[in-house]
C-alpha cells in the first residue's frame, strides 16, 4: 500500500513508522473539545447577565410606588390625619384639611380596606393603603406610643406597657452581653492565631463569660498552652487575712503609782510568744488579755470588768487561747523549796512547831532562810505566796502588798482575783511563788525576825483576806495583807468599804499561850489542780469547826468601826490603849479562821484546855490571841448537825450574859450591865460568855432565832433571861458577843429580822483564849450563816 493512499485518508490508522503524527492528532482533538466547552460556558454566563438586567428593568410598578410613598412620609401622615378627622365626625375640619393639604375630598368616601391607586390631575399623588380602624389608626397608634413613652421615661404607664418594656430591656441586655463576649472571644482567637497556637477551636462566648466570672466550670476550650486558658483564682476572703492585733487593756491610774511597762513584743492575739519574754518581777502591762467577763456565773453582781494588767484571774477573765502551760514558764526560783506530800495534812500546834524548830537545827535555819526569800516581797521574782486551805493539798496564791504585785484601785476589780485565790482557782497571771513551810519556824517568829516593807502604793482591800508576813531588805513594819473572796454562792455587797486588820509583829506572847492551830501548809506547783469544792446548799458557807474540806471563813466584811481605828492619828484605839501605829493608807482585812485539828500526834502535843472550848485559828503571821468582830445583826441557834444532845453545866457555869454599849456610840462605857430580871434584853449591846459553855450543843451565828434540842425558843431562860455582871479584858479567856437588839428579842420563830433592823447598830463580838481539850473531838461549830457584808463592820485581831 502506497503512502499517498494512507495520506489521503487521514482518519485511518497511521503506520507504525510514524508515531509522532498519531500523538499530535490526539492533542488536537482534546484542544477542540476544550474550546467547545468554554464557548458553551461563556454563552450561559451571558444569558444569565441578560436575564438579571431584564429583571431589574421589568420590576413591577407597585414596588416603585411603595418606595415613593416611603419617601413622601408627609403625604402618608396627611392621609391618616384626614382619616382620623373623618372617623371622629369632624367633616368640616376634614374638608378644610383636605383642601389645604391638596388631598382628594372624595378620599374619605372611598374604601380604605385595600390599596387603590388613583392618579389625580396636577400635583395629586398616589395614595397608599390606609389601615382601617374604628377610631382611626392614628389615634390607636398614638395611645400605644404615649403609654410606652411614659413607661420608658419612668412616668408611669399601664401594667402591660411596663411588662413589655421590661421584656424589651432584658432582651437588649442579653444581646449586648453576648455581643461583647463574642467580640472578646474573637480577640482571643485572633491573639492565638498570631502566636501560632490556634488549631481551629471554636470558643463559646457564653462559656467564656462563665469562665471569666470565676465560676467553677470546665474550660471552654482545652488549649495546649496554660496561659491561653488560665483557671480563674477566687477572691481572697478578708475575714481570714484581717487578723488585727488586740491591744492590751491598760487602765493605769497615775494616782496609784503603777508604772506602765512597755511590752517587749507588739501585742497580738497569740499568747504563747508573749508570756515567756516578759519579766515576771515587773508590772506586766503588755500581755494581751481580755477584759471581758467570760463566765457570768462568777460572783460579780456589779458586772464591771476588772483590770487585768496585774490582777487577772481564771475565774472571771479567761482568754480563749490562753492556756496555763503556754502562758508562763517556770523559773528556777519558782520551784517550791519544801513541798511535803499529801499525807502531811494534819495540823500542828504552836508548841510542836517550837519543838520542831529546836530539833531541826541548821536545816530549819536554811529552810527558814529559803522560805523567807520566797515570801519576800522585795525579791526579784517574789509574787503572791501560796496559802493552803485546811485539809487541802493545793495552795492558793495570796495577794502580797508589795510593789511587785499592784492591785487595781477598784474593789470590784479586786474581787475577781480574790475569788480564785481563796477557793482553789489558780491565778495564772499572778507572779506567784511557793509559800513558806511552817515546819521549821512559827509565823510569829518569822514576823518578829524579818521586818516588813512599807508599801508605797497603797490600795483599798474590799473583802477579808489571809494576811501574810512580807519581808524585805528595808526596815519598818507595815500591814501586809492578802485578799480572798467569797464563794460563788455568797451574797456580795456592793459597798466599797475597807475593813482593817491589825497585824502585830511583836512576838511578845508566849507560843504556848497562842492557842492556835496551823494546818500543815503545803505549797505545790502553781499549775497544780485546784482543790475540789464541796457543794453547799446554804446561802453563806460559814466557819465550821473541825471542817478541813472548806475554808474557815467566807464572809465579806464592811467598814471599820470608829472605836477601833483612828484615821487622824493612824493608830488603833483599843481598851488597853493605843496599839502600834499602822499605815492609815493601807487597808487590810482578815478572815475569822477557826478550825479544829484532828486527833493525832499533833493533838497530843498540845497543852490541855478547858473542856468545851474551841480553838480559834488566827490568820497566818498573827501573834495575837484575841479577836474583835463587829456584828450588825446576828442570832444564836444550835448546830443542825449535832447528833448528841448535851446539857448545859450547872451552878456557876451557866451561860452568863454580859452587856456592853456600842463601841461607836459610847467608847468609854463598854460594860454597862442589864438587870437580871429582864426577860428580853432591852439594850442594843449584849454579849454571851462562851467560856462557860462546857459540853453544850454547837453554836451558830446566823440571822435566825435561838433554838435548842432541849428547849423551845420561848423557854430559853439560860441564854437571855439570866444575866450577870462580867468584865472583859483584851487578853482574858472570856468571849464577849455583842449582837444587835434583836438577838434576844427575836427568840420566837414568828419574829423574823428584816433588813431595816439589821443595820441599826453595830455591835462587838470578841473571842478570848479559847482552846480545846486533848483527845476529844470538836464540841462546837461556829458558823456565820445567812449573812452578808452589811452584817459585819470590823474584824480586829488584838495582841
Curated annotation (Swiss-Prot):
Coiled coil (UniProt feature): none
Cellular localization per UniProt: Nucleus
Residue stretches of biased makeup (Basic residues): 354-370, 482-497
Biased composition (Low complexity): 41-55, 307-317, 341-353
PANTHER family: LISH DOMAIN-CONTAINING PROTEIN, TRANSCRIPTION ACTIVATOR MSS11
Function of the protein: Required for diploid filamentous growth, haploid invasive growth and flocculation. Putative transcriptional activator of FLO1.
The protein's name: Transcriptional activator FLO8
Name of the gene encoding the protein in the UniProt record: FLO8
Amino acid at each position: 500500500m502506497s503512502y499517498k493512499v494512507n495520506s489521503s485518508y487521514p482518519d485511518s490508522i497511521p503506520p507504525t513508522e510514524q508515531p509522532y503524527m498519531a500523538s499530535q492528532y490526539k492533542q488536537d482533538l482534546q484542544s477542540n473539545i476544550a474550546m467547545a466547552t468554554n464557548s458553551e460556558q461563556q454563552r450561559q454566563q451571558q444569558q444569565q447577565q441578560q436575564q438579571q438586567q431584564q429583571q431589574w428593568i421589568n420590576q413591577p410598578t407597585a414596588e416603585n410606588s411603595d418606595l415613593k410613598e416611603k419617601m413622601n412620609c408627609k403625604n402618608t401622615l396627611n392621609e391618616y390625619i384626614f382619616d382620623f378627622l373623618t372617623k371622629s365626625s369632624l367633616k368640616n375640619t376634614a374638608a378644610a384639611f383636605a383642601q389645604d393639604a391638596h388631598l382628594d375630598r372624595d378620599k374619605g368616601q372611598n374604601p380604605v380596606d385595600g390599596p387603590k391607586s388613583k392618579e389625580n390631575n396636577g400635583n395629586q399623588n398616589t395614595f397608599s393603603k390606609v389601615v382601617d380602624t374604628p377610631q382611626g389608626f392614628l389615634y390607636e397608634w398614638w395611645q400605644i406610643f404615649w403609654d410606652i413613652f411614659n413607661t420608658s421615661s419612668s412616668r408611669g404607664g399601664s401594667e402591660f406597657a411596663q411588662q413589655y418594656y421590661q421584656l424589651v430591656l432584658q432582651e437588649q441586655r442579653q444581646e449586648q452581653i453576648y455581643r461583647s463576649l463574642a467580640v472578646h472571644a474573637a480577640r482571643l482567637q485572633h491573639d492565638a492565631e498570631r502566636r501560632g497556637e490556634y488549631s481551629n477551636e471554636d470558643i463559646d462566648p457564653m462559656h467564656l463569660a462563665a469562665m471569666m466570672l470565676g465560676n467553677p466550670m470546665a474550660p471552654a476550650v482545652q488549649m495546649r498552652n496554660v496561659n491561653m486558658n488560665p483557671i480563674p483564682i477566687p477572691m481572697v476572703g478578708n475575714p481570714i487575712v484581717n487578723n488585727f492585733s488586740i491591744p492590751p487593756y491598760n487602765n493605769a491610774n497615775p494616782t496609784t503609782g503603777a508604772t506602765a511597762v512597755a511590752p517587749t513584743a507588739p501585742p497580738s492575739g497569740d499568747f504563747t510568744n508573749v508570756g515567756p519574754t516578759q519579766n515576771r518581777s515587773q508590772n506586766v502591762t503588755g500581755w494581751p488579755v481580755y477584759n471581758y467577763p467570760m463566765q457570768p456565773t462568777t460572783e460579780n453582781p456589779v458586772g464591771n470588768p476588772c483590770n487585768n494588767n496585774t490582777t487577772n484571774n481564771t475565774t472571771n477573765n479567761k482568754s480563749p487561747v490562753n492556756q496555763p502551760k503556754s502562758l508562763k514558764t517556770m523559773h528556777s526560783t519558782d520551784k517550791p523549796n519544801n513541798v511535803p506530800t499529801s499525807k502531811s495534812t494534819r495540823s500542828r500546834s504552836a508548841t510542836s512547831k517550837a519543838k520542831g524548830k529546836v530539833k531541826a537545827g541548821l536545816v530549819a535555819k536554811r529552810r527558814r532562810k529559803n522560805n523567807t526569800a520566797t515570801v519576800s516581797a522585795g525579791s526579784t521574782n517574789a509574787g503572791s505566796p501560796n496559802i493552803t486551805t485546811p485539809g487541802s493539798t493545793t495552795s492558793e496564791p495570796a495577794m502580797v502588798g508589795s510593789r511587785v504585785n499592784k492591785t487595781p484601785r477598784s474593789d470590784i476589780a479586786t474581787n475577781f482575783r480574790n475569788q480564785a485565790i481563796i477557793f482553789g482557782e489558780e491565778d495564772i497571771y499572778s507572779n506567784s511563788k511557793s509559800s513558806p513551810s511552817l515546819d521549821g519556824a512559827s509565823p510569829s517568829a518569822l514576823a518578829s525576825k524579818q521586818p516588813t516593807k512599807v508599801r508605797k502604793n497603797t490600795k483599798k482591800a474590799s473583802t477579808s483576806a489571809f494576811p501574810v508576813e512580807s519581808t524585805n531588805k528595808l526596815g519598818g513594819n507595815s500591814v501586809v495583807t492578802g485578799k480572798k473572796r467569797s464563794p460563788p454562792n455568797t451574797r456580795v455587797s456592793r459597798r466599797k468599804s475597807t475593813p482593817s486588820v491589825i497585824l502585830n509583829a511583836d512576838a511578845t506572847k508566849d507560843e504556848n499561850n497562842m492557842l492556835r492551830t496551823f494546818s500543815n501548809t503545803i505549797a505545790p506547783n502553781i499549775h497544780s489542780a485546784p482543790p475540789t469544792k464541796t457543794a453547799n446548799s446554804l446561802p453563806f458557807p460559814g466557819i465550821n469547826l473541825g471542817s478541813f474540806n472548806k475554808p474557815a471563813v467566807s464572809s465579806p466584811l464592811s467598814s471599820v468601826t470608829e472605836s477601833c481605828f483612828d484615821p487622824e492619828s493612824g493608830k488603833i484605839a483599843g481598851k488597853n490603849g493605843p496599839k502600834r501605829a499602822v499605815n492609815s493608807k493601807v487597808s487590810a482585812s482578815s478572815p475569822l479562821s477557826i478550825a479544829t485539828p484532828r486527833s493525832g500526834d499533833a493533838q497530843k502535843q498540845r497543852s490541855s484546855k478547858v473542856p468545851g472550848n474551841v480553838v480559834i485559828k488566827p490568820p497566818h503571821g498573827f501573834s495575837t490571841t484575841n479577836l474583835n468582830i463587829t456584828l450588825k445583826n446576828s442570832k444564836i441557834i444550835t448546830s443542825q448537825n449535832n447528833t448528841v444532845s448535851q446539857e448545859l453545866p450547872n451552878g456557876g457555869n451557866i451561860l452568863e450574859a454580859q452587856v456592853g454599849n456600842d463601841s461607836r456610840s459610847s467608847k468609854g462605857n463598854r460594860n454597862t450591865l442589864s438587870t437580871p430580871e429582864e426577860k428580853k434584853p432591852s439594850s442594843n449591846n449584849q454579849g454571851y460568855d462562851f467560856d462557860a459553855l462546857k459540853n453544850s450543843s454547837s453554836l451558830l451565828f446566823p440571822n435566825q432565832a435561838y433554838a435548842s434540842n432541849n428547849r423551845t425558843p420561848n423557854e430559853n431562860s439560860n441564854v437571855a433571861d439570866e444575866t450577870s455582871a462580867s468584865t472583859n479584858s483584851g487578853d482574858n479567856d472570856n468571849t464577849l458577843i455583842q449582837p444587835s437588839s434583836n438577838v434576844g428579842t427575836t427568840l420566837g420563830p414568828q419574829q423574823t429580822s428584816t433588813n431595816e433592823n439589821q443595820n441599826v447598830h453595830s455591835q462587838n463580838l470578841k473571842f478570848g483564849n479559847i482552846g480545846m481539850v486533848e483527845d476529844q473531838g470538836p464540841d462546837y461549830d461556829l458558823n456565820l450563816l445567812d449573812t452578808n457584808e452589811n452584817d459585819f463592820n470590823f474584824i480586829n485581831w488584838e495582841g
